[in-house]
Amino acid sequence: MTLDKLIEKLAAKSSILITPITVKDYLAYKIEPNFLLPFLKALKESEELRFTLLTDLFGADFPQNNVVNSVGLGHKEQGAKPITNRRTTSDNVGESKSIDYKRFEVVYNLLSLKLNKRLIIKVYISEKETIPSAMNIFSAACWYEREVYDMYGVNFEGNDDKRRILTDYEFEGHPLRKDFPLTGYTQVKYDEKLKKVAYEPVDLDIEYREFDFSSHWHSPSYVLPGDEKATDVIPAKAGIQK
């Protein structure tokens, strides 16, 4: 029996709903947050699979992501109604369609030493939702979850350790969110009077600039060596040699 069939059989046996998704070179599934812990536990304890290592756990932010909740394998139904979140669109008069904007993607990367195989599990949540912590199944999840919280503000239910792990303790916001300003909210400097590091509002010493790389003033007019994307050789401008 192939690996995907074994996993789908395990999910069906435990009444866990999973949906196959396409990820290059990897076997991957999408799952709803309420099924995450039972699925992780089943994968770890299965004698046939033995996905005993959580090698990575990370997040991504897609603000316009409209992933709709769906019933996957291991369930009698063929589909499920999406959960209403923030927006409702109408295609026809008198008919409305709800869209669940799940902007955050949390990815679990599992490894089976027995099979020498990797498995990717993706969970999608909205800003107001939480994900159950996997600490009691994989102890390594604690620091991974702290990193995802630090970078994106995703809360893991059951993990009360909200200490910053990559940024400093007084950092404001979550820097990998798409709505986080490029300049940040505060800047750090060493205060000679206080004899310690101090935080203050961002004060740019020079005007904030947006570089237009399509302008010949800021980009080379010749094809860069090794640029496989270049199809035509751009004529050299005056004063610029190929």
From Swiss-Prot:
Transmembrane segments: none
Principal cellular location given in the protein's record: membrane
Gene3D superfamilies membership: NADH:ubiquinone oxidoreductase, 30kDa subunit
Reactions catalysed, as given in the entry: a quinone + NADH + 5 H(+)(in) = a quinol + NAD(+) + 4 H(+)(out)
Localization: Cell inner membrane
Keywords noted in UniProt: Cell inner membrane, Cell membrane, Membrane, NAD, Quinone, Translocase, Transport, Ubiquinone
Superkingdom of origin organism: Bacteria
MF-aspect GO terms: NADH dehydrogenase (ubiquinone) activity; NADH:ubiquinone reductase (non-electrogenic) activity; quinone binding
Membrane topology, as annotated: Peripheral membrane protein
Ranges for region Insert: 67-101
Keyword hit for Isomerase: no
GO cellular component, one term: plasma membrane
Uppermost EC category: translocase
EC number per UniProt: 7.1.1.-
Record-stated family: Belongs to the complex I 30 kDa subunit family.
Function: NDH-1 shuttles electrons from NADH, via FMN and iron-sulfur (Fe-S) centers, to quinones in the respiratory chain. The immediate electron acceptor for the enzyme in this species is believed to be ubiquinone. Couples the redox reaction to proton translocation (for every two electrons transferred, four hydrogen ions are translocated across the cytoplasmic membrane), and thus conserves the redox energy in a proton gradient.
Assembly and binders: NDH-1 is composed of 14 different subunits. Subunits NuoB, C, D, E, F, and G constitute the peripheral sector of the complex.
HAMAP family: NDH1_NuoC (MF_01357)
Protein name, UniProt field: NADH-quinone oxidoreductase subunit C
The organism of origin for this protein: Rickettsia conorii (strain ATCC VR-613 / Malish 7)
Source taxonomy: Bacteria, Pseudomonadati, Pseudomonadota, Alphaproteobacteria, Rickettsiales
